[in-house]
Amino acid sequence: KNGYLLIILHFDNTLYINLSMTKIYKFQDDISTEALKDLEKCSSLAIDTEGSGLQIPHRDKLSLIQFSTGNNDAYIIQPNRKNYKAPNIVKILENAKVTKIGHYLRYDVSGLEYFLKCNVKNIFDTKVASKLCRTYSQNHGLKDLVLEFCGKKLDKRLGSSDWNKKLDELTDAQLQYCSNDVIYLHKIRDALHKMLVRENRLELYENSIHFLKTRIKLDQSGFTEDIFQH
């Protein structure tokens, strides 16, 4: 009906879905031990989150967590919003051997660390990289990077969906939206890294990422403004 090939297989608490050729694995509360072992074998992992708002403490919630290994797959996890206990997710986020690739990680890392009580290690932010090397453009959104480096047009209209619905209530289109936020990030990271090297701005980027952790701590402490501004 919608041009989708949809196959659902049950593996314990995991659902495998082939949606528009994207392999989607759905998990409730946490990823399985088997999935953790698979993800730990990766040198890099794309990450993203969906929330019920701007993550104002005691009001908004971390609704979904998405991962991708870069092989046109997506792991979509709905954390337990009562206690946010997800030890396997925490293990992969704190694994310094695995680079976590994301777009505007100032938002995602802040939410993950606040709700999961973890320390996300080894990150690559495609938005920061884009601003440092794509100076020929004023457009640094994910959809802009996907179009330029992957030749795909993303539909971002579902970004304001109710992500707090039950996992099995999310539509095929919503699942694909969540997947699109991670499945292209590896290719984008590779392209931007080459540009940073070419423009001799890799060290500047690395220093910016080093400061990003402090920027996130400032956000979490209520200092959302630019403290360096006059």
Question: How should these model regions be labeled?
Answer:
Residues 210-230:
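Long, charged alpha-helical interface segments
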Residues 20-144:
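Conserved RNase H-like, two-metal-ion catalytic cores of nucleic-acid enzymes
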